[in-house]
Swiss-Prot record:
Keyword Cytoplasm included in the entry's annotation: yes
Coiled coil segments of this chain: none
Function recorded in the entry: Catalyzes the GTP-dependent ribosomal translocation step during translation elongation. During this step, the ribosome changes from the pre-translocational (PRE) to the post-translocational (POST) state as the newly formed A-site-bound peptidyl-tRNA and P-site-bound deacylated tRNA move to the P and E sites, respectively. Catalyzes the coordinated movement of the two tRNA molecules, the mRNA and conformational changes in the ribosome.
Binding positions (GTP): 17-24, 85-89, 139-142
Organism annotation: Chloroflexus aurantiacus (strain ATCC 29366 / DSM 635 / J-10-fl)
Protein name, as recorded: Elongation factor G
Subcellular location: Cytoplasm
SUPFAM superfamilies registered for this protein in UniProt: EF-G C-terminal domain-like, P-loop containing nucleoside triphosphate hydrolases, Ribosomal protein S5 domain 2-like, Translation proteins
GO CC field: cytoplasm
InterPro entries: EF-G-like_DII, EFG_II, EFG_III, EFG_III/V, EFG_IV, EFG_V, EFG_V-like, G_TR_CS
Residue spans crossing the bilayer: none
Primary localization: cytoplasm
């Protein structure tokens, strides 16, 4: 079956935003206008098509990044837009990370009233990390307190972006009725709230001067990004709409400018123009750099590692990245993947080069938010899902077995909060284990383990809401009821002074003995560095084949620290000397020696406990400002800054996670439900001595 849509007509985009900016509503409208949805789903009615999990429909927030294909015609040309809906709640940043990795462009939705919110900044930084070109949509222009100018100013100040305004709103709040196209210098006016009666008119006389000024600024901005256009502009030549749009497309893809549009998605205003802009300014897979990877078993960035490049073409060897695993109630496990190069037909075998295992693509689906179509073949630049993968997980590369390549995987943050769960009945024990392991397969920031001392099942995640949603899914999808303990903080341990440690592990019990001898220098690293292992052995005093065992022994020993049994972090270990025995040495002996060495070194290294610190932003009416600040102080918080936003005050603070449990509930009752807050993990820092002592005593009593 030949390719239906040319590669340069494909757009892979994500719709990214803060919680209530109206992202799912915007996506819904896109699906409606592109003809894939017959009745518009409303988030506040709980029927939105993209939010297909019951938890999302109840909470009115988006949790899973569903990938949807939508057709769009512009000037008689057919395009295919693949949309990945991403959540805006901070506990789900992992979803945002993994979708950004496979997108070519993003639509960032802002709330016209609140402007740039904390989560918008986080998401913007994540998009910067993956070099994703984007356009902005200022939504909710019909709401009381909306201000397009303020929102654009915040995009400049807070995000450090260069907004290129391509539309101006006509009216605001109740009187918002359309937009001015600064390229064509025409007004688009909406005469109903269904987006059916739309007319193109002359710009209202009172808005003409502002529109002309904005158009001149836009032309100047675009001309500055391109030498050819700059010359024409300086010579006083009139640039055509085509030249300007071409210039803006190039500047957007090079991330020099960010086009800004506006509308009110709920009232069906501005969404069609947004779709036009997606097609006009965001890149096709051909506009993005070719994907690079390494041969299996090699690490990108190491010396002498050959970098393999795969061109974006149907004729290149098949190369794809699995970016999401979903347990679908109808077809079982689904693996969403993005094809970077080549094509694949259903029924073919591919190599999962990350795990060196074969995978058969029995059925390939193209997804609409919750109905699916079977397809025969997937081509470069497309997004699809395979049914029932046996060996593939998030971040894995699947490729042509004759041309192996491993793409850079997706990196996920470590979980910061944990709780103990137990099934309500003995009979549910097995069901709970299956449910939790399946949920952990889907979500790399969710971990499950059994506490070796208490035998309890412990689940870890990115925040209270994250774990709440997981337990909720376990109840609904797997019918397992669980009791949960109080949330616990994941502390860490580290050393504060360098330590030189020598350890011998010798065991003679008749027959073959055990012998491992290591000298390792341990040094503290800056917070957030993790673990660094350096092999400085010269002259083969420890044979090469035992070095990995030493590193593995250290890594395993770091999982449980010495002072309170928490993981050890931010340590550099340099193996510089040791010895071995021709007969008695083995990998096991060196692993045990390294493990003992680490434990002894931590004891001598003036160890200390570290606690996770959350970055909190609370928006409160003026009259509760004192209450909010006082509350932060009582939670060992550090106020970082305050500013006015409209008629509200924004307080930013760093607060230990241990003091943030139940914060949202307390905040609501203290401010009559009028303050809102969001928090995300920021860094680890040393725990005050008195508190550390308390925790150590509690742990040793258990």
């Amino acid at each position: 079956m030949p390719r239906q849509i040319e590669l340069d007509k494909v757009r892979n985009i994500g719709i990214i935003a803060h919680i209530d900016a109206g992202k799912t509503t915007t996506t819904e409208r896109i699906l409606f206008y592109t003809g894939r949805t017959y009745k518009i789903g409303e988030v506040h009615e709980g029927t939105a098509t993209m939010d297909w999990m019951p938890q999302e429909q109840e909470r009115g927030i988006t949790i899973t990044a569903a990938a949807t294909t939508a057709p769009w015609r512009l000037d008689g040309v057919e395009y295919r837009i693949n949309i990945i809906d991403t959540p805006g709640h901070v506990d789900f940043t992992v979803e945002v990370e993994r979708s950004l990795r496979v997108l070519d462009g993003g639509v960032v939705v802002f709330d016209g009233v609140a402007g740039v919110e904390p989560q918008s900044e986080t998401v913007w930084r994540q998009a910067d990390k993956y070099n994703v070109p984007r356009i902005c949509f200022v939504n909710k222009m019909d709401r009381v307190g909306a201000s397009f100018e303020r929102c654009v100013q915040m995009i400049k100040d807070r995000l450090g972006a260069k907004p290129a305004i391509v539309q101006l709103p006509i009216g605001v709040e109740d009187s918002f009725r359309g937009t001015i196209d600064l390229f064509k210098m025409k007004a688009t006016v909406y005469y109903d709230d269904l987006g059916k009666d739309i007319r193109e008119e002359e710009i209202p006389a009172e808005l003409r001067p502002a529109a002309e000024q904005a158009r001149n600024e836009l032309i100047e901005m675009i001309a500055e990004t391109d030498d050819e256009l700059t010359l024409l502009y300086l010579e006083g030549q009139e640039l055509t709409v085509e030249e300007l749009k071409r210039g803006l497309r190039k500047a957007t893809i090079e991330r020099k400018l960010v086009p800004v549009l506006c509308g009110a998605a709920l009232r069906n205003k501005g969404v069609q123009k947004l779709l036009d802009a997606v097609v006009e300014y965001l890149p096709s897979p051909l506009d993005r750099p070719a994907i690079t990877g390494t041969l299996p078993g090699q690490v990108m960035g190491d010396e002498g590692v050959e970098v393999i490049t795969r061109p974006v073409s149907d004729d290149a060897p098949f190369t794809a990245l699995v970016f999401k695993i979903v347990a679908d109630p109808y077809v079982g496990k689904l693996a969403y993947f993005r094809v970077y190069a080549g094509k694949i037909t259903k029924g073919s075998y591919v190599l999962n080069s990350t795990r060196n295992q074969r995978e058969r693509l029995g059925r390939i689906l193209r997804m609409h938010a919750n109905h699916r179509e079977d397809i025969e073949e997937v081509y470069a630049g497309e997004i699809a899902a395979m049914v029932g993968p046996k060996n593939s997980y998030t971040g894995d590369t699947i490729c042509d077995p004759d041309h192996p390549i491993v793409l850079e995987s997706i990196r996920f943050p470590e979980p910061v909060i944990e709780l103990a769960v137990e099934p309500k009945t003995k009979a549910d024990q097995d069901k709970m284990s299956i449910a939790l392991s399946r949920l952990a397969e889907e979500d790399p920031t969710f971990r499950v383990y059994t506490d070796p001392e208490t035998g309890q099942t412990i689940i870890k995640g990115m925040g209270e809401l994250h774990l709440e949603v997981i337990l909720d899914r376990m109840r609904r999808e797997y019918k397992v009821e669980a009791n949960q303990g109080k949330p616990q903080v994941s502390y860490r341990e580290t050393i504060t002074i360098p330590v030189d440690q020598e350890t011998r592990f010798v065991r003679q019990t008749g027959g073959k003995g055990q012998y491992g001898h290591v000298k390792i220098k341990f040094e503290p690293l800056p917070p957030g560095s993790g673990f660094e292992f350096v092999n400085a052995i010269v002259g083969g005093v420890i044979p090469k084949e035992y070095i990995p065992a030493v590193e593995q022994g250290l890594r395993e020993a770091m999982q449980t620290g010495v002072i309170a049994g928490y993981p050890v972090v931010d340590v550099k270990a340099t193996l510089y000397d040791g010895s071995y025995h021709e007969v008695d040495s083995s990998e096991m002996a060196f692993k045990i020696a390294a493990s003992m060495c680490l434990k002894d070194a931590v004891r001598r290294g003036k160890p200390q406990l570290l606690e996770p610190i959350m970055k909190v932003e609370t928006v409160t009416p003026e009259e509760f400002l004192g209450t909010v600040i006082g509350d932060f102080n009582s939670r060992r918080g550090r106020i970082e800054g305050m500013e006015a936003r409209g008629n509200a005050q924004v307080v930013r603070a760093f607060v230990p996670l241990a003091n943030m449990f139940g914060y949202m509930t307390d905040l609501r009752s203290a401010t009559q439900g009028r303050a809102t807050s969001s928090m995300e993990f920021d860094h680890y820092e040393p725990l005050p001595e008195a508190l550390a002592k308390e925790i150590i005593e509690k742990r040793s009593a258990n």
